[in-house]
């Protein structure tokens, strides 16, 4: 039930916080010649974080000449892979929820439904682990590439001590951090569901039968041995009791002694 409730929600949060991100930073370059300064240089970037395609112009503080620069790095592969896994996990979890609720009988026919569900769950657990780890590394690269201090080092005007370069504001990465957290939460959720899905498959039931058969054979042989022992003991006890008492012939011969003695007298 937890899988049915939380899997679609966690998947939505994962791809929404990553795929819907857009941010930016603002820098300022204050030249010695104030007319050449630019105190508001906006640099915007967004998903899928092809930072090398993000270009911007900055003053050189050498006349009216301007310098065209671009951010460094490309984290699009890890970001797109992460979002793709999240979208497909969301779609599959929705389909699985519908099957669990409305088609429970067909789901259990011929063990095909639980078997497919088990395989898909294992695959998505692996994909969530790989995708979340790759995106965590990609996010780290994005943070470095969009750090205002790193961007200022790209500007030739900022290499001159007479010019003043500073960051007005840095990009906000809270939603991207949240996407990584939800990525690993999805991995924990899907990996934890492997055991519960495995219990629905025929592999688990066949394993239970394999373990129970030797125990049943052992218990049946034990009961059979106990029965033979009881029967042997009962027969032995009966014959032993029969031999303890005097026989009917002995009871019949006891009065014959005194009778013959009286006749002789």
UniProtKB/Swiss-Prot annotation:
Membrane protein topology class: Multi-pass membrane protein
Ranges where the record places region 5 X approximate repeats: 210-242
Tissue: Central nervous system.
Name of the protein in question: Synaptoporin
Protein's job: Intrinsic membrane protein of small synaptic vesicles. Probable vesicular channel protein.
GO cellular component: hippocampal mossy fiber to CA3 synapse; neuron projection; synaptic vesicle membrane
Superkingdom in the source lineage: Eukaryota
Domain MARVEL: residue ranges: 1-202
Region feature (Disordered): 221-265
Species in which this protein is naturally found: Rattus norvegicus
Cited InterPro entries: Marvel, Synaptophysin/porin
Lineage summary: Eukaryota, Metazoa, Chordata, Craniata, Vertebrata
Pfam families from the UniProt entry: MARVEL
Residues exposed to the Cytoplasmic side: 1-4, 103-114, 199-265
Intervals holding Sequence repeats: 210-214, 222-226, 227-231, 232-236, 238-242
Family under the similarity heading: Belongs to the synaptophysin/synaptobrevin family.
Transmembrane segments: 5-25, 82-102, 115-135, 178-198
PTM-bearing positions, type Phosphoserine: 212, 220
Sugar attachment sites: 33, 38, 177
Vesicular side: 26-81, 136-177
Family matches, as PROSITE patterns: MARVEL (PS51225), SYNAPTOP (PS00604)
One of the GO biological process terms: modulation of chemical synaptic transmission
Gene this chain is encoded by: Synpr
Compositional bias (Polar residues): 244-265
Composition skew (Low complexity), residue ranges: 224-243
